From Swiss-Prot:
GO biological process per UniProt: ATP export; protein targeting to membrane; protein targeting to vacuole; protein transport to vacuole involved in ubiquitin-dependent protein catabolic process via the multivesicular body sorting pathway; ubiquitin-dependent protein catabolic process via the multivesicular body sorting pathway
Keywords: Cytoplasm, Endosome, Membrane, Protein transport, Transport
Function: Component of the ESCRT-I complex, a regulator of vesicular trafficking process. Required for normal endocytic and biosynthetic traffic to the yeast vacuole.
One matching Pfam family: VPS28
Record's subcellular location: Cytoplasm; Endosome; Late endosome membrane
Cited InterPro entries: ESCRT_assembly_dom, Vps28, VPS28_C, VPS28_C_sf, VPS28_N, VPS28_N_sf
Start and end residues of each VPS28 N-terminal domain: 11-125
GO cellular component: cytosol; endosome; ESCRT I complex; late endosome membrane
Organism: Saccharomyces cerevisiae (strain ATCC 204508 / S288c) (Baker's yeast)
Membrane topology, record value: Peripheral membrane protein
Protein name as annotated: Vacuolar protein sorting-associated protein 28
Family stated for the protein in its record: Belongs to the VPS28 family.
Length: 242
């Protein structure tokens, strides 16, 4: 960026300088470069904001629903910026969240953890974000009473099938699989907040896929392994309903 030398005449009022526009970008910067810089600045702001939200939640300054909605929105915005039209240029400056924070001297350990895992902590640990429900509609709170909401069970079942079908159709990229797996986990949490065998494997896969770089894909071996773990989780989920 060009440096502007300011020279004042003795009779010149310094207040006039405050009316002069100070350019944010050097004239030599192209529109594409400007867009890349603006995108990186948005990513920077998301990291800082997310870290504050995580800390606020840990201090009980915001409730589960506020936290989940805010973090979910920030994570989606983060992914949109990384997958923008200029993603090739963005990736030159964003090798990883850790490298990005080191480059711009960002201290945000809570945000880094959340961005690496790719889902709100309430989804990861099956923390309920429902404060109330209509009578007869809130039957998914525990497996001990053996009562589950039929609608939520159907949604979770459908999401299991959707993910497995996607893998069989050779879906193997981060942007293809992560949203499907995240939605699957959320739908499972609506049915029950109790842990069950192989649930942790779903979370491991969500985190593992979220850490893939743009352009990286799962290998055939990894796809078979994911399918196998999904089938085990599906059986364990249904065993919980019996």
């Amino acid at each position: 960026m060009q440096k502007h030398n300011i020279k004042l005449n003795q009779n010149q009022d310094i207040s006039q300088l405050f009316h002069d526009e100070v350019p944010l970008f050097d004239n030599s910067i192209t529109s594409k470069d400007k867009e890349v810089i603006e995108t990186l600045s948005e990513i920077y702001s998301i990291v800082i904001t997310l870290d504050h939200v995580e800390k606020a939640y840990l201090k009980d300054s915001i409730d589960d629903t506020q936290y989940t909605n805010t973090v979910d929105k920030l994570l989606k915005q983060f992914k949109v910026y990384l997958n923008s039209q200029n993603k090739e240029e963005i990736n030159k400056h964003f090798q990883s969240i850790e490298a990005f924070c080191d480059t711009y001297n960002i201290t945000a350990s809570n945000a880094i953890t959340r961005l690496e895992r790719g889902i709100p902590i309430t989804a990861e640990h099956a923390i309920s974000t429902t404060t109330s429900a209509p009578s007869g509609d809130n039957k998914q709170s525990s497996s001990s009473d053996k009562k589950f909401n039929a609608k939520y069970v159907a949604e979770a079942t459908g999401n299991f099938i959707t993910v497995m079908d996607a893998l069989k159709l050779n879906y193997n990229a981060k942007d293809q699989l992560h949203p499907l797996l995240a939605e699957l986990l959320i739908s499972i949490n609506r049915v029950t907040r109790d842990d069950f065998e192989n649930r942790s494997k779903l979370i491991d896969w969500i985190v593992r896929i979220n850490k893939l770089s743009i352009g990286d894909t799962l290998t055939e071996t990894q796809i078979r392994e994911l399918l196998f773990d999904l089938e085990l989780a599906y059986k364990s989920f249904y065993a919980l309903l019996d």
